[in-house]
Amino acid sequence: MHRYQTLIEYLGTSFVGWQIQKKGISIQKTIQLTLTRLLKQKIILYGSGRTDSGVHALEQSAHFDIKNKIKNIEKLVKSLNFFLNPKMISIINIKKKNLNFHARHSAKERSYLYLIQNRISPSTINNKREWHIRKKLDLNLIKKGSKKLIGTHDFSTFRASNCNANSPIRTLNDVFVIKSKTQIKLKFKSKSFLKNQVRSMVGCLKYLGEKKWNLRKFENIIIMKDRKRVAPPAPACGLYLEKIIY
């Protein structure tokens, strides 16, 4: 048995998410079927994590096992992209790995990126690829709020009601807030995240940036661990799984 890691880029707009669902088209199933077709054996793809419907990836990581060694990886990548590119999926690379490697369990850090377009007019080019916010946001307040999130905390406040994680305790390694002209980029780094955690944190930072909340209220919202008090989560369209570190 041989194991291969694949790095994947995709636009999640037209998919139900990464994971195979009973209804709708998933990214996982789309790639699995194409691999099965080309390699002429049933392939099961294991991702580093699930992305929800509408969420994109700059470099999702996954692995699959195959009986025989792939003779020409470059040819396989080209063939995969021939079928997948029209569906807004791109295979960046395929690498041979040992059988101890696991796309999810071997990950040391995950990086998510969230894009906000902060101007009066929405972007035509980045339609459904970023969150358009008309009201001018206070970047300094957002930066101060983001620093309060760094460290090991009980993130119950930002946890989806249907989150299946055993514990709400997570360690956020770092948060970066960068503005380029009218686009704001928020980057979050952690070994693992709770379901909807990033989108919920961005939604709360938006309230802070709009001055609907002051910094003290933002801190209290985190401490209270009450989902009813939290701001609405940011839309999926602005969220990107950026990179998996092993």
Spans of features found by a protein language model:
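Structured-RNA-binding interfaces characteristic of tRNA pseudouridine synthases
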Residues: 1-246
